[in-house]
């Protein structure tokens, strides 16, 4: 009888121990707490609140669907605006929205032009990983391509401290033209390329069209000797020229706080190519303006005439 009592008490203690361990397990219930809260407002508009502890929000895409506009809102401020062809009837693939820079903040998305009946609401998910492995039969292996998304014009190719920098027109939210960013990759031999985070993203002035980069070795702009300075077209209803600079060999860029640096009444006003002209001791910018090319000069990369 005593032996049976001891065995019963031992079993009870083990059971209680297991329950207690489950209660204090730091991962227990974590996945369940990573929620996506969807509120449909009618007329194609929805508010989606997400858990900021996840690294990515994965959006389901259907190539044949019309574009929906998304506003990413962090602590009540719009930090990003982009268009996505959200899945309505089927999922062709997923694209990631990076949430990693907003830990401990309140993140929501304002979806516009996305019907309540669309499949996307059931398929979107939070994840700490995004598999961008190249499994496509006809995807180039030798020629550069982004890890995912769409690219075209190479921009701002520059060499500094043993590294070649390739920037390019990039849509990280689909496989068609749109949402223009500057993508970025680095190589030491022009053959093997290492993908980098987006270098320059759209802002209130517009999306990021083509341009060029220079290395300001003499610090003419005052950003710092050896700064990589990028010039690009900010494109919205009108096109203006803007500038950003990097002090860490292109790993991050800071936009010039007095953008735009050059404006025009011409609707087509884009694609700045900047270089140093030794004879005049000035920087020269070549711009496509309407149906002609125009030349501008500057002593400091900021003030152009």
Predicted regions and their residues:
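Intrinsically disordered, low-complexity regions enriched for glutamine and histidine
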Residues: 1-2, 271
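Beta-rich carbohydrate-recognition and catalytic domains
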Residues: 32-272, 276-305
């Amino acid at each position: 009888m005593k032996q049976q009592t001891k065995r019963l008490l031992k079993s009870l203690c083990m059971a209680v121990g297991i329950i207690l361990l489950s209660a204090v397990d730091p991962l227990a219930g974590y996945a369940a707490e990573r929620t996506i809260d969807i509120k449909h407002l009618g007329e194609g508009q929805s508010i989606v609140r997400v858990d900021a502890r996840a690294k990515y929000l994965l959006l389901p895409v259907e190539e044949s669907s019309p574009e929906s506009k998304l506003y990413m809102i962090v602590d009540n401020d719009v930090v990003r605006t982009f268009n996505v062809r959200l899945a309505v009837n089927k999922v062709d693939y997923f694209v990631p929205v990076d949430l990693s820079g907003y830990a401990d903040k309140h993140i929501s998305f304002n979806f516009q032009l996305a019907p309540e009946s669309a499949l996307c609401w059931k398929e979107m998910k939070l994840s700490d990983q995004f598999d961008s492995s190249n499994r496509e039969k006809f995807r180039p292996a030798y020629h550069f391509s982004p890890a995912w998304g769409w690219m075209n014009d190479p921009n701002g190719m520059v060499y500094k401290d043993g590294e070649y920098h390739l920037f390019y027109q990039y849509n990280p939210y689909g496989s068609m033209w749109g949402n223009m960013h500057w993508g970025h990759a680095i190589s030491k031999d022009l053959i093997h390329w290492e993908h980098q985070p987006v270098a320059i993203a759209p802002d209130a002035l517009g999306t990021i069209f083509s341009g060029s980069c220079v290395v300001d070795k003499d610090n003419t702009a005052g950003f710092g000797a050896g700064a990589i300075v990028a010039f690009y077209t900010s494109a919205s209803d009108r096109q203006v020229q803007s500038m950003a600079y990097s002090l860490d060999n292109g790993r991050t860029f800071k936009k010039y706080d007095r953008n735009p640096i050059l404006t025009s009444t011409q609707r087509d006003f884009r694609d700045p190519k900047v270089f140093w002209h030794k004879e005049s001791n000035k920087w020269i910018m070549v711009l496509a303006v309407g149906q002609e090319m125009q030349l501008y000069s500057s002593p400091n990369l900021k003030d152009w005439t």
